[in-house]
């Protein structure tokens, strides 16, 4: 029996805090190019729920997968790792 109730957790940087109760978090990952072998950086942006509007631009935060809060929000900020 595996524990499937573990939610995904990602670490990224807040790149936008303009929306109410929402921050945009950029997740960077390194991948090897399939043909040339060079290590390149790929990034994805996720909208995450921030109930108290406490996370600011540039903060490094951990986000966790949750039930959908809106059309584009299915992640929630868990904690701050580094304050800008």
Curated annotation (Swiss-Prot):
Q: Which InterPro entries match?
A: NA-bd_OB-fold (IPR012340), Ribosomal_uS17 (IPR000266), Ribosomal_uS17_bact/chlr (IPR019984)
Q: How does it assemble?
A: Part of the 30S ribosomal subunit.
* Presence of the UniProt keyword Cytoplasm in the record: no
Primary role: One of the primary rRNA binding proteins, it binds specifically to the 5'-end of 16S ribosomal RNA.
HAMAP family (alphabetical): Ribosomal_uS17_B
Kindly list the biological process annotations in GO that this record carries: translation
GO cellular component terms given for this protein: cytosolic small ribosomal subunit
Alphabetical list of NCBIfam families matching this protein:
PRK05610.1, uS17_bact
Family the UniProt entry places it in: Belongs to the universal ribosomal protein uS17 family.
Superkingdom of source: Bacteria
Looking at the Swiss-Prot or TrEMBL record, what is one Pfam family this protein matches? Answer: Ribosomal_S17
**Keywords for the protein's UniProt record, in alphabetical order:** Ribonucleoprotein, Ribosomal protein, RNA-binding, rRNA-binding
Protease found in the keyword field = no
The terms under GO molecular function for this entry are:
rRNA binding; structural constituent of ribosome
State the Gene3D superfamilies in the record.
Nucleic acid-binding proteins (2.40.50.140)
What name is this protein filed under?
Small ribosomal subunit protein uS17
Which ranges does the record mark as transmembrane? Answer: none
SUPFAM superfamilies under this entry? Answer: Nucleic acid-binding proteins
State the gene name recorded for this protein.
Answer: rpsQ
Q: Write down the PANTHER family for this protein, in alphabetical order.
A: 40S RIBOSOMAL PROTEIN S11 FAMILY MEMBER, SMALL RIBOSOMAL SUBUNIT PROTEIN US17M
